[in-house]
């Protein structure tokens, strides 16, 4: 179905469906892109870990502000990228262009993405936050 859409929009050669990409290959793909776009409109998109993967490679992110999800929290608007209203293809395209076509904006969001990853999402930071949560819960149960 997606390939049919690509063909009908005359995008063959411009859009390629990759299928499954192994964890080992991911950094190469993120390295090859200019901007990472998470265009999901589904409320089931709770967090969008793919954003963190892209941010770990210093890639600016364009994502959607899905209500009641963590997607727009992960991608801090105007820090690590731009968040737009879900389902607004025009706003999504303009956000991608705003980053990809402006070197200063690209550099700022790229640096912001990597800094946000290092501040909040490294394995060590995530383990420390989980431990802090568990320690707090253990203290509550002992009282």
Features from the language model and the residues they span:
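Short alpha-helical donor nucleotide-sugar binding micro-motif in glycosyltransferases
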Residues: 20-21, 28-33
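Short acidic/histidine- and often glycine-rich active-site loop of Leloir-type glycosyltransferases
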Residues: 65-83
